[in-house]
C-alpha cells in the first residue's frame, strides 16, 4: 500500500474533526454549553480486513475526542463518539460485495442485527440532550454487541 493511500483517511478524519470541533467550540464557549459528537469505528483492528489507514483514523478520532473533552469540559462542552460497527443502510445498493459486508456486520453482533440509521439518530438525540449531561469523554457503543466494552 502506498503511503498516500494509508494516510489519506487519517489526515481527512483528524482534519475534519478538528476543524469542525474548533468552529463549533467557538460558539459553544460563548454560550457555556454544547455537545460535540463524533462518529467512529470501534475497538482494535479486525483480523482479515485490510482497511489500510481507516482503523488508524478511527483511533485518532477517539484520541482527539478525549483531548477535546479535557480542553472543552471546563467551558461546559461535552464531547462524545458514537460507535456503530457499521450501518448496512449506508452501503449503497449495487456496491460490489455489499451483501457479504452486511452479512459480516450482522454476524459479528450478539443481537443478530446491526444498528439502523434510526438507532443512530435516537442515540445521538439522547447524547445531545440534557438527559446525558453527565456523559463526556466517552464513546457510546451502539454495535449491537459486536464490540464488548
Give each language-model segment a name.
Residues 125, 136-149:
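Short C-terminal tail/terminal secondary-structure segment
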Residues 109-120:
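A conserved structural motif in NAD(P)-dependent oxidoreductases
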Residues 26, 70-71, 133:
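Alpha-helical segment proximal to the catalytic Tyr-Lys
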Residues 1-7, 93, 101-105:
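Substrate-binding pocket helix/loop in short-chain dehydrogenase/reductase
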Residues 2-19, 37, 54, 61, ...:
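Catalytic Tyr-X3-Lys loop
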Residues 21-22, 66:
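A short, exposed helix-loop element centered on a Lys and neighboring polar residues
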Residues 73, 78, 135-137:
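Short, small/polar-rich loop/turn modules that mediate ligand/substrate recognition or access, typified
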Residues 35-61, 65-74, 86-87:
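Catalytic loop of short-chain dehydrogenase/reductase
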Amino acid at each position: 500500500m502506498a503511503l498516500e493511500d494509508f494516510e489519506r483517511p487519517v489526515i481527512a478524519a483528524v482534519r475534519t474533526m478538528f476543524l469542525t470541533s474548533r468552529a463549533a467550540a467557538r460558539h459553544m464557549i460563548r454560550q457555556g454549553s454544547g455537545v460535540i459528537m463524533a462518529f467512529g469505528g470501534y475497538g482494535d483492528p479486525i483480523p482479515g480486513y485490510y482497511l489500510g489507514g481507516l482503523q488508524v483514523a478511527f483511533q485518532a478520532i477517539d484520541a482527539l475526542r478525549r483531548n477535546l473533552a479535557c480542553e472543552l469540559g471546563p467551558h461546559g462542552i461535552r464531547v462524545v463518539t458514537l460507535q456503530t460497527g457499521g450501518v448496512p443502510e449506508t452501503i449503497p445498493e449495487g456496491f460490489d460485495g455489499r451483501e457479504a459486508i452486511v452479512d459480516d456486520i450482522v454476524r459479528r453482533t450478539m443481537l443478530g442485527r446491526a444498528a439502523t440509521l434510526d438507532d443512530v439518530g435516537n442515540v445521538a438525540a439522547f447524547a445531545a440532550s440534557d438527559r446525558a449531561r453527565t456523559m463526556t469523554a466517552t464513546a457510546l457503543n451502539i454495535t449491537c454487541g459486536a464490540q464488548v466494552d
